[in-house]
């Protein structure tokens, strides 16, 4: 199934199957803060993943702008095996929607929480493929800004699909000033984001490092219950544990990659994802 962070429906917004324009919503796959994901079919019974924005956000201009921008960015980068397939986006009955290829998959968080065999048997290739998907996005001029295990889908054949581009933006010529609300998931955000400082595409590289650390150790590199606690751990590395201390089976070269991704100073991380990909490949398939 398409995997996104699950949320409990509110009493006044319980989703039910039924017609939606020329589509029929067959089954609710998952709920996010901004939209539902449905298994939908058209008049030919072809299955799709249909992402429909919540009705309660119909007058929220910022949310609508993010939804549309994310759909437009997906339409520009979809020609890659590591990116979920785009079909169309628009508005039906006043509700914004995004139509994507239907993928039988689980997200990475679900896979490692249950120690799924697909992950255990293919972890090296998954690490490479999710980096390659991020590289494709950057090469097309966009940064994801919400890169985390929940936004990486993996099929039963271990094919990777990067999803959820609501926070994505163009890579700026100079560091971008954060918005006041500073959206994102704190556990995967770089120090400059949590500090409210200008940032660049290097924040995605940091996020990849957090995800890879977590994937290989089943621990977070900077644990904390609040953004402040997480930031304090990022800034004060006295209690930081290197990945191989958790899992000695991690190749030394891969640990080196992760540690470079997690550098406090953005300038000490990889300058671009392509270099990171090559070092990951060398580390895992040497």
Predicted regions and their residues:
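Protein kinase catalytic-loop region centered on the HRD/HxD motif
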Residues: 132-142
């Amino acid at each position: 199934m398409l995997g996104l962070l699950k949320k409990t429906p509110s009493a006044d917004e319980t989703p039910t199957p039924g017609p939606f324009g020329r589509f029929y919503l067959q089954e609710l796959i998952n709920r996010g803060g901004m939209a539902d994901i449905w298994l939908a079919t058209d008049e030919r019974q072809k299955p799709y993943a249909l992402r429909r924005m919540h009705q309660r956000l119909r007058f929220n201009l910022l949310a609508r702008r993010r939804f549309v921008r994310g759909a437009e960015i997906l339409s520009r980068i979809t020609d890659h095996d590591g990116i979920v397939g785009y079909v169309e986006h628009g508005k039906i009955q006043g509700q914004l929607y995004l139509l994507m290829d239907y993928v039988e998959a689980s997200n990475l968080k679900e896979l490692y929480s249950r120690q799924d065999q697909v992950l255990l048997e293919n972890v090296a290739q998954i690490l490479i493929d999710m980096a390659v998907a991020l590289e494709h996005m950057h090469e097309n001029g966009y940064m994801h800004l919400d890169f985390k295990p929940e936004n990486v889908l993996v099929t039963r054949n271990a094919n990777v699909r990067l999803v959820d581009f609501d926070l994505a933006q163009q890579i700026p010529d100079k560091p971008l000033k954060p918005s006041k609300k500073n959206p994102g998931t704190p556990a995967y955000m770089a120090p400059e984001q949590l500090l409210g400082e200008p940032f660049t595409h290097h924040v995605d590289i940091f996020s990849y490092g957090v995800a890879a650390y977590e994937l290989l150790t089943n621990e977070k590199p900077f644990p904390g219950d609040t953004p402040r606690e997480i930031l304090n751990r990022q800034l004060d590395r006295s209690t930081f544990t290197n990945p191989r201390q958790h899992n000695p089976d991690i190749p030394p070269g891969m640990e080196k990659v992760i540690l470079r991704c997690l550098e406090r100073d953005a300038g000490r991380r990889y300058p671009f994802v392509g270099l990171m990909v090559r070092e990951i490949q060398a580390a895992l398939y040497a």
